[in-house]
């Protein structure tokens, strides 16, 4: 299964990185970092003035699609997203399967003012501290990659550092984990990370099971304004959109069209 392969490789990478820069060393480096993470909730909460909050993704490649963007300038893409009305920016940092890089996070942080999401396969506290040091305001935690206890522990550590987590679910059992852990931002990924099959009805199936007061994010398979309208009516607050924007030459125009429609 592809998710298992990615997690295995991720753990191998963490061992190498921690041998070079320990968790304690990373923690001490925060003394030189006075930046406070942004309040993600205020950026992702839908309002009548901005009902379609978009987390626009900086992503070069994926296991299912291969290279999505040959001419890849992460800083320019992120700046276009902010101008185009993104509420936050998701940055792929996984190097082997998505051709991401942790340095993209630090580079983009210097040029945009909206919240940044470290999107990776996070399974240790070390990666969470890395995210903060490199400029993230919130991180992705994938329920399918963690036990209930692990998810709760990592979410608690994330909040201890002043950040928040987007907890991604793919089915009812994942959702049970997310609720048990106390997740306040729940992402419903229409793509199954084990099989890469899409289920665009998943948001409609899971939203009724989510307690009130949570921010709900729809992920994957979102290409047009009508989907935002329909999902918003069902209870979605924000939308994580990557490939459909990354395939456009003008990301700013593509994002505006997605948010506001053709007119």
Swiss-Prot record:
It is an enzyme of class 4 (lyase). InterPro entries: Aldolase_TIM (IPR013785), Indole-3-glycerol_P_synth (IPR045186), Indole-3-glycerol_P_synth_dom (IPR013798), Indole-3-GlycerolPSynthase_CS (IPR001468), RibuloseP-bd_barrel (IPR011060). It catalyses: 1-(2-carboxyphenylamino)-1-deoxy-D-ribulose 5-phosphate + H(+) = (1S,2R)-1-C-(indol-3-yl)glycerol 3-phosphate + CO2 + H2O. It comes from the Bacteria. Keywords: Amino-acid biosynthesis, Aromatic amino acid biosynthesis, Decarboxylase, Lyase, Tryptophan biosynthesis. SUPFAM superfamilies: Ribulose-phoshate binding barrel. The keyword Mitochondrion does not apply. Pathway: Amino-acid biosynthesis; L-tryptophan biosynthesis; L-tryptophan from chorismate: step 4/5. Belongs to the TrpC family. PANTHER family: INDOLE-3-GLYCEROL-PHOSPHATE SYNTHASE, TRYPTOPHAN BIOSYNTHESIS PROTEIN. This is Indole-3-glycerol phosphate synthase. It comes from Sulfurimonas denitrificans (strain ATCC 33889 / DSM 1251) (Thiomicrospira denitrificans (strain ATCC 33889 / DSM 1251)). The lineage of its organism: Bacteria, Pseudomonadati, Campylobacterota, Epsilonproteobacteria, Campylobacterales. The gene is trpC.
